[in-house]
Amino acid sequence: MATFGGFTAAVLTAAELNTAGGAWSTWTPTIASWTQGNGTVVAVYEQVGRTVNCYVLITWGTTSSGFIGTVSLPKTAARIGATGSAAVEDVGSFIATCAVNVTTTTLCAVTLINSAGTYGTQSALSATVPHTFGSTDNVRFSLTYEAAADGT
């Protein structure tokens, strides 16, 4: 008898097995402090049981403005605190190492990892930190977290 992740059935059905590792779903996240203009957002996720994996790529266009404040999650998180990897790219110049943190059960925030001191610290992004965002610059992250019991 097989069990799998958060599935409640003692024996997996073909339908349940087909959802594991299948195509990811898209969602439209709400992004605070950013005006999309002609920029683009790619946001995809998969949920297997209560485990949610997501990937987001936010690219500035010529009419985009602001910076990335918080980004809404595709599914409500069971708790705050999950951390994933992120990057901010000033195209043609540098890629800054960042983290993404679940800050509420519905939001995450990308933070810059500042290595200027003895220990790395996390700093909030702003309109000028780590640089002034322009066309083709991007913020991207991947994150894994546990969904709330109701799966919304």
Each model region followed by its residue ranges:
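Surface-exposed molecular-recognition determinants
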Residues: 2-152
